[in-house]
């Protein structure tokens, strides 16, 4: 092997780097010139170990520095992660606090409802038995199912959807008890949720917390209030989807009932629940299901015939009838009060005087006897009776009956008066010989008086329908008018035809004196028929006739 050349400056050969065997082999083939060029190319330099160690230390320091920076970056990342975790924990803690507050509010609300239920007394409608006390719900004890009245078992459609008693899935079976453990203590219904049970118990307790701000009507459930508000706003969100049908409804149940009318494949409809069936046999099988059902309108109004499904609805309807009757009575009393304000304190007597002053006829008094004058006064009193009796007799039928009774009494009194006159010893039965103290009209012996009576007998009497004294036509004629008994049965006893020309000439000699009126008033038969207020009518009529004759 060729020896390696020694390094200059007395440096030992161990201080140089040794070449590999291949390099040495390649160097042997090179010339000296080539070696020089190779030395220049490879630039062989002597390497000092101290310098190498120093470089190594610097490299180690650099690596340490790089490691510290990386460690610091990791620490910063960890700190950021910890901060994020703390923020998340803080947010979770806030959410927990909010949930706790909500739970506390719910618990407080439930306590208030429980306090209201415990302190609330059940109203009269729906009716509940007096001997049974209110029972509160306790899930630990077995439910008691007392027999309640029909009004207390009232339930809403939502209660029927949430739970039903006695049927499949209700409170009567074993599977229903497991799926719906919350049972009502007042009825046989059961529910799957306690909130549904609390809403249902409001029906039995009569609690209606939801009030309409427009009409102040109260409801047990919020959904019922929302449906009721649509009646005020006119909102109808449920529209019929049938082609060409523009109808819309405020409630879904009404739309469902309406949609059945478009079903052509099911022509047989149930009148109780509006369900439709394809054949008649299925409908006949369905109808018995409504027996003892809440759909039947068994509560009927005796006044108008309307029927309702619940007794409470019938009571509200009857209350409307009572309010209407009260309003009619108030209106009638106000009308009577208005009439009384226009009538003076004289009452009926003054009204009779006004009527006599306006309608007096001189010939009428000239041809009247005592009986006809009394009959005219009685008829005038009868004409004024509806004004006075209208205050006390609100019913027209009773008023008419009362008037008939008074007419009958007056007729009886007239008959008694005529009988007394007939039984008088000095009484004459001739129509031309009247005593001076008996009648209101003076005794007439003039030829004009006989002429008038002959004309009255010759003139045909009108029918009973045209007479002003129809109520007295059926009475027995008095004893001093026996000449009329030969007349036909249709003629009246007190019918006179007026002759204005003869009466106007004969009237001044036929005036009534005041002492004769007083004597007539003091007679035993006439005192009960004509009062002192009505006797003033004759005097006022006489004065008016005098003025007219002058």
From Swiss-Prot:
Residues 73-105, 400-416, 444-460 have a biased composition (Low complexity). A zinc finger (C2H2-type) spans 182-204, 210-232, 238-262, 268-290, 299-321. GO terms for biological process: cell differentiation; nervous system development. Residues 73-179, 399-485 are annotated as: Disordered. The modification Phosphothreonine is found at residue 424. Keywords: Developmental protein, Differentiation, Metal-binding, Neurogenesis, Nucleus, Phosphoprotein, Repeat, Transcription, Transcription regulation, Zinc, Zinc-finger. It is found in: Nucleus. Residues 141-156 have a biased composition (Polar residues). Residues 106-117 have a biased composition (Basic residues). This is Zinc finger protein squeeze. It comes from Drosophila pseudoobscura pseudoobscura. The lineage of its organism: Eukaryota, Metazoa, Ecdysozoa, Arthropoda, Hexapoda.
């Amino acid at each position: 092997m060729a020896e390696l050349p020694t390094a200059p400056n007395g440096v030992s050969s161990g201080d140089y780097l040794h070449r590999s065997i291949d390099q040495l082999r390649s160097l042997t083939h090179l010339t000296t010139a080539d070696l020089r060029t190779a030395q220049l190319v490879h630039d062989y330099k002597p390497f000092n170990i101290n310098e190498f160690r120093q470089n190594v230390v610097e490299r180690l320091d650099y690596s340490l520095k790089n490691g510290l920076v990386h460690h610091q970056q990791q620490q910063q990342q960890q700190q950021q992660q910890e901060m994020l975790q703390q923020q998340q924990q803080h947010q979770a803690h806030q959410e927990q606090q909010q949930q706790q507050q909500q739970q506390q509010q719910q618990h407080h609300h439930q306590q208030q409802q429980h306090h209201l239920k415990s302190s609330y007394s059940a109203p009269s409608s729906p009716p509940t038995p007096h001997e049974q006390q209110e029972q509160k719900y306790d899930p630990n004890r077995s439910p008691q199912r007392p027999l309640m009245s029909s009004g207390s078992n009232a339930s809403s459609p939502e209660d029927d959807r949430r739970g039903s008693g006695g049927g499949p899935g209700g409170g009567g079976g074993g599977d229903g008890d497991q799926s719906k453990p919350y049972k009502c203590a007042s009825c046989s219904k059961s529910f799957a949720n306690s909130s549904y049970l609390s809403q249902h118990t409001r029906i039995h307790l009569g609690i209606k917390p939801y009030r309409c701000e427009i009409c102040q009507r109260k409801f047990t459930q919020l959904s019922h209030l929302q449906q009721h508000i649509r009646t005020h706003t006119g909102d109808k969100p449920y529209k019929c989807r049938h082609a060409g049908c523009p109808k819309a409804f405020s409630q879904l149940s009404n739309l469902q009932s309406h949609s059945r009318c478009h079903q052509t494949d099911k022509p047989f409809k149930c009148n109780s629940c509006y369900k439709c069936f394809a054949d008649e046999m299925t409908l006949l099988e369905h109808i018995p299901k409504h027996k003892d059902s809440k759909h039947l309108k068994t509560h009927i109004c005796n006044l108008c015939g309307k029927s309702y499904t619940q007794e409470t609805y019938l009571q509200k309807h009857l209350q409307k009838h009572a309010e209407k009757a009260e309003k009619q009575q108030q209106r009638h009393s106000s009308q009577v009060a208005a009439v009384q304000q226009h009538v003076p304190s004289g009452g009926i007597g003054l009204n009779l005087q006004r009527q006599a002053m306006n309608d007096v006829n001189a010939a009428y008094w000239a041809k009247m006897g005592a009986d006809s004058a009394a009959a005219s006064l009685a008829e005038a009193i009868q004409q004024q009776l509806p004004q006075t009796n209208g205050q006390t007799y609100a019913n027209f039928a009773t008023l008419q009956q009362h008037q008939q009774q008074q007419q009958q009494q007056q007729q009886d009194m007239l008959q008694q008066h005529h009988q007394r006159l007939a039984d008088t010893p000095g009484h004459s039965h001739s129509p031309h010989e009247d005593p001076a103290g008996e009648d209101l009209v003076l005794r007439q012996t003039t030829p004009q008086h006989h002429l008038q009576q002959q004309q009255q007998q010759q003139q045909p009497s009108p029918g009973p329908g045209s007479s002003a004294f129809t109520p007295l036509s059926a009475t027995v004629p008095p004893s001093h008018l026996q000449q009329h008994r030969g007349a036909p049965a249709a003629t009246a006893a007190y019918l006179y035809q007026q002759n204005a020309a003869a009466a106007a000439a004969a009237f001044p000699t036929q005036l009534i004196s005041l002492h004769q009126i007083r004597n007539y008033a003091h007679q035993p038969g006439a005192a009960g028929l004509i009062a002192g207020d009505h006797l003033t009518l004759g005097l006022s009529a006489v004065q008016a006739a005098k003025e007219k004759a002058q």
